[in-house]
Amino acid sequence: MDEGTAVPAWVEPQISRIGKTDLVIGTPSFNNASTIGYVASVAAVGAREHFPSSGVVLVNADGGSIDGTQEVFRGSEAPPDIERIAFSYRGIPGKGSALKAIFEIAARLDAHACVVLDSDLRSVEPNWVQKLAGPIFAGFEFVSPCYIRHKHDGTITNNICYPLTRALYGARIRQPIGGDFGVSRHLVHTYLEKDVWATDVARFGVDIFMTTTAIAESGRIAQAALGRKVHDAKDPAAELGPMFSQVVSTLFDMMIRYEHVWNTPAPSGAAEMPGLQMADDDEPDPVPVDVPRLIASFRNGVREHSQALALALGKRASVIEAVASSASDADVGLSCEEWALVVYDFAAAYRRNIEHRTSLIRALVPLYNGKVASLVLKAKEMSSRQAEELVEEQCRAFEESKPYLRDLWE
């Protein structure tokens, strides 16, 4: 292994002994001892059930857990012919570095397909392996997940990643940062060749990097209907700030990298792919959201980041300031149209102002929190299925405002 590898040298003999395999199933982890054993054992069952004659290797790339995550992974149930590799990855601490390590092993083993499963999953089933790996064996390059999720789960996806990816590339990939996916041999090598692994791609930016690169550079893309996703969901008010910053900075970086793909008269991305229909009785477990905390972040953040807001929004910053100073919490937040324009303004400002990129992303966080708060309040009496129409409304606003982005970009 070379100096830039995310895989420690002591793993090399095991990789050399295995030599080659058909399918690598990777689980990035950090203190997931309570769930990773279940994920690994279900993955092994699924691999043998659906790909009985294929060589399979399970890989756990861990971020230095102190709860015995690696030991639980090694002790999980698996047929004797399925190899298991567990180690602490090298490099920047983060999910992206873990995935880089998994991809490096998949490349070394010349695996035809690489599947990644989140290590905090409580709803994974054996058929997930078939749904994520099967299309790769059939000739697809990338398989993105499609879940039934609670209306307050996936707020970064619903409010920026999905609408922006759909508007830019014409690709209706419902969960572009879903965490569970299938990747072809060719795309694994494409990812590893990119000079991005010292950026936010090494952290939570990795999922949107993977999806966008797949849209822009690979062949066929599929979506896998995986049903309900039950995992350790996070309150956006309490835990998603750093994740938002890393995802959105990467999203904007990808816009700059692939402007030749999206900034054309007609979108050239993947064709529309079917999503997953939800019945009214499929309501997922609720995800708590601290709305007052989100609103406080919005109000305080608009005051704190006034200079960055002026840089990104120009005269329209005063409109945001007026909304933030509203006396009523019910009136706080941005409409779908306003939010789409704000994101486009920030993307263009991020491109123009290299030296201010960090401050711009920080300034966008409270506006995002205000948007999430308004969406939560609007969806209060809705089922998760009904709330999906609010996401569609947001997507349409991004699509209809795309000419505004093109004008900004020139």
What are these regions (language model features)?
Residues 1-45, 410:
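N-proximal low-complexity "stem/linker" segments adjacent to membrane-targeting elements
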Residues 61-71, 121:
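A conserved acidic beta->alpha catalytic loop
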Residues 245-410:
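Terminal low-complexity segments of carbohydrate-biosynthetic enzymes
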